[in-house]
């Protein structure tokens, strides 16, 4: 039986870009990732898919990169040849993943091992959990509803394409939906449909396998885990963001220049994002909190540094759909270039409640790490003492309880 994942390229580009930095700069780092489902309830307990998940992981850990896949990675200008040589030998090791269930029929997943292994499991496992869960709920009516919603999106993109002023900065969206997709075949169908409807708007996909297959641009730079790791590396905690950005610059020399801002919140990020970084990075990515407030803060920061914000890119990727993206573009288009990464709403809009699942880095080298998101519900750690200390160091207030 062919597994749900049948290519190691079937993941997000930023896994490769982050893995390359880890391999080159801190390859001995040890990490722990933990799974969490944020849904209050599910149609059936996730514990029910445990056996199938175990089998899928066994199959995943048999996969190797093919010569054709390695050739594609080598063609990306920011991927270095020694990294591709490493990937030729690469194979995920099953022993680093533990799967269990608890007395409430919840699924527990722990990935613990070298970061150069553990980091690469995340997207695969989330995509497998999603597909196994929704497979049991599939009916012809579900596919029909998904298709109806997809055609409505395609029609809306055609309208937007017709309304765009060619003299204004373009409205560009990308698929960021691998981790929470309905299944790979559906993700491909969605991208093909939207590309055909509005080729000038659909910029690419975060999924490397589909970017290669469809001949479109793979999109991505860094995730929270990259910055969080520096909370436990050999730098003062207060300086972890600067160290992470410096490390990125050292690796990519101006390429892949979009920085993620919400590991300890936008205000704390901007205190570290000085003139040097602001000139060097092409722009910023929003992933939590009010996107309008966030973008206005970014604009004020660039103004203060006397940088023309119209030369910079704001990328939005937090719970978007086409309408929210278009509204944000209208608001910011005169001040910034914009880009929009749309995830679940593209790849799993079938009428069911999607799974809100994550697999997050919680420890690095035996030390807790955390994210103080601009959205309180996205804060995740297994150590409340460290979280309080992080708040204190970066002067981030406790979120108000409703």
Swiss-Prot record:
It catalyses: nicotinate + 5-phospho-alpha-D-ribose 1-diphosphate + ATP + H2O = nicotinate beta-D-ribonucleotide + ADP + phosphate + diphosphate. It comes from the Bacteria. GO terms for cellular component: cytosol. InterPro entries: N/Namide_PRibTrfase, NAPRTase_N, Nic_PRibTrfase, Nic_PRibTrfase-Fam, Nicotinate_pribotase-like_C. Pathway: Cofactor biosynthesis; NAD(+) biosynthesis; nicotinate D-ribonucleotide from nicotinate: step 1/1. Pfam families: NAPRTase, NAPRTase_N. CDD domains: PncB_like. Transiently phosphorylated on a His residue during the reaction cycle. Phosphorylation strongly increases the affinity for substrates and increases the rate of nicotinate D-ribonucleotide production. Dephosphorylation regenerates the low-affinity form of the enzyme, leading to product release. Its EC number is 6.3.4.21. GO terms for molecular function: nicotinate phosphoribosyltransferase activity. The modification Phosphohistidine is found at residue 224. GO terms for biological process: NAD biosynthetic process via the salvage pathway. Keywords: Ligase, Phosphoprotein, Pyridine nucleotide biosynthesis. Belongs to the NAPRTase family. Catalyzes the synthesis of beta-nicotinate D-ribonucleotide from nicotinate and 5-phospho-D-ribose 1-phosphate at the expense of ATP. PANTHER family: NICOTINATE PHOSPHORIBOSYLTRANSFERASE. This is Nicotinate phosphoribosyltransferase. It comes from Neisseria meningitidis serogroup B (strain ATCC BAA-335 / MC58).
């Amino acid at each position: 039986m062919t597994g749900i994942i049948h290519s190691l390229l079937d993941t997000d580009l930023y896994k490769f870009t982050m893995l390359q930095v880890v391999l080159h700069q801190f390859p001995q780092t040890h990490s722990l990732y933990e799974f969490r489902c944020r849904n209050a309830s599910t149609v059936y307990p996730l514990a029910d898919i445990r056996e199938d998940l175990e089998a899928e992981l066994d199959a995943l850990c048999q996969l190797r990169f093919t010569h054709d896949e390695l050739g594609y990675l080598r063609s990306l200008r920011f991927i270095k040849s020694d990294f591709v040589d490493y990937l030729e030998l690469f194979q995920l090791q099953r022993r680093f993943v533990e799967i269990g269930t608890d007395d409430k029929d919840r699924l527990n997943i722990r990935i613990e091992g070298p970061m150069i292994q553990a980091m690469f499991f995340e997207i695969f496992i989330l995509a497998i959990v999603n597909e196994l869960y929704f497979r049991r709920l599939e009916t012809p009516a579900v596919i029909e509803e998904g298709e109806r919603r997809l055609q409505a999106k395609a029609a809306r993109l055609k309208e937007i394409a017709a309304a765009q002023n060619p003299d204004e900065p373009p409205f560009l969206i990308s698929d960021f939906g691998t981790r929470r997709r309905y299944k790979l075949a559906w993700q491909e169908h969605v991208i093909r449909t939207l590309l055909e409807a509005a080729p000038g708007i659909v910029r690419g996909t975060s999924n490397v396998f589909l970017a290669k297959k469809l001949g479109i641009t793979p999109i991505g730079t860094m995730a929270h885990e990259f910055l969080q790791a520096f909370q436990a590396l050999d730098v003062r905690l207060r300086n972890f963001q600067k160290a992470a950005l410096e490390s990125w610059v050292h690796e990519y020399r101006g390429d892949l220049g979009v920085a993620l801002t919400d590991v300890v919140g936008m205000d704390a990020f901007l205190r570290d994002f000085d003139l040097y970084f602001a000139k060097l990075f092409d722009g910023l990515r929003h992933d939590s909190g009010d996107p309008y407030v966030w973008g206005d803060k970014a604009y004020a920061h660039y103004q203060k540094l006397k940088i023309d914000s119209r030369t910079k890119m704001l990328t939005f990727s937090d719970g978007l759909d086409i309408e929210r993206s278009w509204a944000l573009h209208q608001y910011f288009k005169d001040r910034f270039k914009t880009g929009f990464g749309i995830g679940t709403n593209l790849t799993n809009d079938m009428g069911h409640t999607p799974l809100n699942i994550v697999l997050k880095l919680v420890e690095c080298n035996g030390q807790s790490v955390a994210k103080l998101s601009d959205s309180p519900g996205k804060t995740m750690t297994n150590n409340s003492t460290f979280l309080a200390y992080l708040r204190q160091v970066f002067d981030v207030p406790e979120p108000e309880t409703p």
